């Protein structure tokens, strides 16, 4: 995936019909969709490595995807109903990708 494609995917998934809306509505989150998004974030992170700042719109999109998606998804769970392990793992990977970009960490 190119840097431009990755940015487009990040912005789309943070938008009106994106992943965070699906999580807010209680829809099933496909681990492959989340994994593709994490890959896109890592592509963008590689392109920004060493940069002193990032675009405000990108930062807002990353905040939505890295922190609000898992919070929204978690709000639909209960003591008796948990997120499927594959979904949970993919959301943790998504959060890690966002944190790595913000802190300029290469793994």
Kindly label every feature range from the protein language model:
Residues 1-38:
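Short terminal alpha-helical segments
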Residues 5-6, 33, 37, 54-61, ...:
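Residue-level detector of well-ordered alpha-helical segments, enriched
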Residues 5-10, 19, 23, 44, ...:
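Generic structural signal of hydrophobic/aromatic residues within well-ordered alpha-helices
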Residues 16, 27-28, 46, 55, ...:
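Acidic-enriched, low-complexity/disordered segments with a strong bias for Aspartate over Glutamate
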Residues 17-26, 44, 48-51, 72-79, ...:
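Secondary-structure edge/capping motif, primarily at the C-terminal ends of alpha-helices
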Residues 49-63, 78-81:
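Short, charged early-sequence alpha-helical segments and their helix-coil boundaries
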Residues 63-107:
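Amphipathic alpha-helical binding modules
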């Amino acid at each position: 995936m190119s840097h431009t494609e990755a940015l487009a995917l990040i912005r789309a998934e943070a938008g009106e019909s994106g992943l965070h809306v699906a999580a807010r509505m209680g829809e099933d989150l496909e681990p492959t969709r989340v994994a593709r998004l994490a890959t896109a974030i890592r592509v963008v992170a590689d392109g920004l490595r060493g940069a002193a700042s990032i675009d405000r719109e990108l930062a807002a999109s990353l905040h939505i995807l890295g922190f609000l998606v898992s919070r929204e998804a978690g709000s639909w769970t209960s003591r008796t109903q948990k997120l499927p392990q594959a979904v949970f793992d993919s959301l943790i990977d998504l959060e890690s990708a966002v944190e790595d970009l913000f802190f300029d960490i290469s793994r």
